[in-house]
Amino acid sequence: MPSLAKWLGDTLESVMASKFIQVKLTGKELVAPAVVKLYFEGNLQGIPFHEGNAVAFRVNQIDYRNYTPSYWDDSGCEIIVHLHSNGPGSRFFEQIQPGAQLKMLIPRGRKMFDNSFATHTVIFDETGLGYATSVFEASSKNGQEFYAFGNVPGPVNNIRFPFNATNAKNGQYHLLEQDFQAFLDRYWIAAKQGAFYMVGNGKLVQITRNVLRSRGIQRQQLFTYTYWIEGRKGL
């Protein structure tokens, strides 16, 4: 969601009160450098959730930030958040502690999972760990194949799925493409007829999509969602 004047945000929460759920932060766990998993409890019964949907929190008087849940059921959800010093959402969740009561805007937005495919491959960075987890959960539930390629800094702990990792820092696009090509070479026979989901940094999405198109992957197999772009206001 965009930034809103304080009075408009207050009005929104009043007029759309049924769209906001009261949740309690019950746990906070570091799973990777500058990446935390947040555990929320609340009455989510009857609220639909689809992989790729986002919830939103008001992180200060004027800013809302969207996050894709990694897990969702009737009694609570999990969200994986990338923390950095440049964004209001990052500052908010860096400071908040278990026990805090929050208003959460219910899931909405894109549906980024097509269960008509038998194989699902997710390409992501540290901002897409939550989404990748949700696709793993959905594909496992359906008995479908799942593969993952992540550009993340350092080791990742307590994530429910295995993935091939690279650590191509800003500007190291040749390394990102090289490692992604090697990943595809390893899993190509199994993955090439399936769906490919690319989320996170705009450059990661662009590079990996171009690689897949050059290998003959059709547009209807590709699903993309750019979460952030270098130089833009942070998460």
Task: Tell me what each language-model feature is.
Residues 1-235:
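Extended, composition-driven regions rather than compact fold-specific motifs
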